[in-house]
Amino acid sequence: MARKDNKGRNLKTGEYQRPDGRYEYRYKDEITGKRNSVYAADLASLREMEKKINKDMDDLLITDASVKKLTVNTLFERYMATKNIKERTKKNYIRMWDYRIRNTLGNIRVVDFKTSHVRTFFSALSDEGLAHSTIKGLYGLLNPSFELAVEDGIIRKNPVTGTFGDYGAPAKEKEALTLEQQEKLLKFVEQSNVYKPHLPMMQVMFGACLRVSETIGLTWSDVDMKNREIHVGGQLVYYEGDEGYCFHDSETKTDAGIRDIPMTQMVYDAFRKQRELNLMLGLQSNVEIGGRSGFIFNTKHGRPIMPAGVNSFLKNIVNAYNKKESKLAEEEKREPELMPPISSHTLRHTGCTRLGENNVNPKVMQYVMGHSDAQITMNVYNHIAEKSHVENEMSKMNLPETVPAVV
């Protein structure tokens, strides 16, 4: 005999009317096997809920109540648990999430998350002046997290996919120093009593196109002076670990980062000068990091130079150069030719540019740079080729001063 409610209406399987008059629907989630209940004030509302539950189960979605409460923050934690990435990279991702997402989008339930949420979020970040690359990084955390929710049967469709567009301020184009600027800067450093100790390191970064983390991570065992090769097999990174902020020995950024770079004469001479400097100034490495010792570029305390320290002395060098150039230009009654701001990456980018200007094969450039993606190298190569082509074409416009009259 069919069960009825207090109005005499037949109740379907799983439907119940409670003593307080409210309606309940009991069911078992087919994926998790858990029993669940939903409640409504009237039978019509309950049956609308039943339709949605049955549709979800037909689509192989999890209907378990606890899963429905899953927040975006918890989803991200699940996603991170699936990633086999370096500890430093994981910490960077979590730091980015905590700073921008945890207290904004993070508390929204995954099943309630809409495309409008993320578009509004990105738009607000754009209004704050965040860079395009920063917003792209946040998209790179949100999108795969929600993709995991789709794969796990929590939601039908990823609400984040396709939302990343032109949000954020465009990245400034990375400018390499011209050959003239490079030569002037190195000459200034060589003639400076204050900055001359930094000359070998700068020459190595220019000539070998190394990342700053690779440069400060070089040990004397990585440098084969006999065969004139640099063996790049790791890097030093500075970040917060279990013991606070300190250096960590790390693998190269990608497998392509492991490489043997032939030394140019400038680089070979730079290593010889650095060895002499270390002996003369007492800049001997006295630390062991990750089982490695004998670091080449050190502070007066015998520890490797921090990346921020490299950028700091580069900034000071440019400021000193520009101060001297401005004074000289004033004396010579001309406009000063100032050096643009530079960073450690400028030296690497400039070195890559010199390779391109000398028509080094793009595949060789990719190998020297340690790029896993050939497109990164080609972007630099094509920029150089395009600039050279434009200059060559425009040079055709240099007509003689006296142009023959057309008869």
What positions do the PLM features span?
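Short, basic (Lys/Arg/His-rich) helix/loop patches that form interaction surfaces
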Residues: K12, E128, K187-H198, A208, ...
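Short, polar N-cap/turn motifs at the start of nucleic acid-interacting alpha helices
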Residues: D222-E229, V360-V380
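DNA breakage-rejoining catalytic core of tyrosine-based enzymes
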Residues: V111, I155-K157, G168-K187, G233, ...
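C-terminal catalytic core of Y-nucleophile DNA break-rejoin enzymes
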Residues: V38, D42-L43, H231, E240, ...
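Catalytic-site neighborhood detector that most strongly recognizes the C-terminal catalytic loop/helix
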Residues: G168, A176, L236-Y238, M369-M394
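N-terminal DNA-binding module of tyrosine recombinases/phage integrases
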Residues: N10, Q17-S116, L277-R292
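N-terminal core-binding DNA-recognition domain of tyrosine site-specific recombinases/integrases
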Residues: D29, V38, D42, K68, ...
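C-terminal secondary-structure termini that scaffold catalytic or DNA-interacting sites
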Residues: N227, Y238-E240, Y245-I258, Q265-V267, ...
